Amino acid sequence: INEDAPTGTGLLAFTIGDVETPAGSLTVTRTSSNLVLVPLANVVLGGSDASRTVIVTPAPNQFGSTTITLTVSDGTNTVNTNFTVNVASVNDDPTITIIADQIINENTTTGPLAFTIGDVETPVGSLTVTRSSSNNTLVPLANIVLGGSGANRTVTVTPAANQFGAATI
C-alpha cells in the first residue's frame, strides 16, 4: 500500500475455528513488528464468531515493512498466522503557511510578511520558494522580494509607483 493511504489495507477477512470451542468464544489478538510504522492501535480487529476482519493503517508519513501477527486462543491453546504489510514511500507536497490578503495605500509597501515552509521528505534548506504576480503592471516580479532562511521566510511586496488595483502574489 502507499504511505498515507486513507483506508490502509482495507478490510481483510479471515475465518477462525476450533473443534472444541465455539468460534464466538475464541479470542483474537494482534501484534506489529514495527510499531513506528504500524502502531498496535492501527491494527483494528472486527467481525464476530468465525468471520473476522482486520484493517491495518500505517502511521502518517511512515513507510517500510511490518509483520502483522494474528493470534487465536481458546484459553488454553493458541495458533498464529503472519502477513507482511509493505508501505511504499510517497512524495508529499511541501507546505507553506497562508498569508492573509493585504490592503495597502498607493506608493507604500506591505513590509515583510512572515510565512513558513516545510516538507516531510526534504530539508527546508533544499526547498525553493518562487514568486509570481497576476498583475505585472501593478506588481512587477522585481518588486516581490523574498527573505529569510530555513523554515522562516518573508515576502515584501512593493507596487509600482503611482499604480493601484489588485494582484494575486
Where are the regions a protein language model picked out?
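Extracellular/luminal low-complexity segments enriched in Ser/Thr/Pro
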Residues: 53-63, 154-166
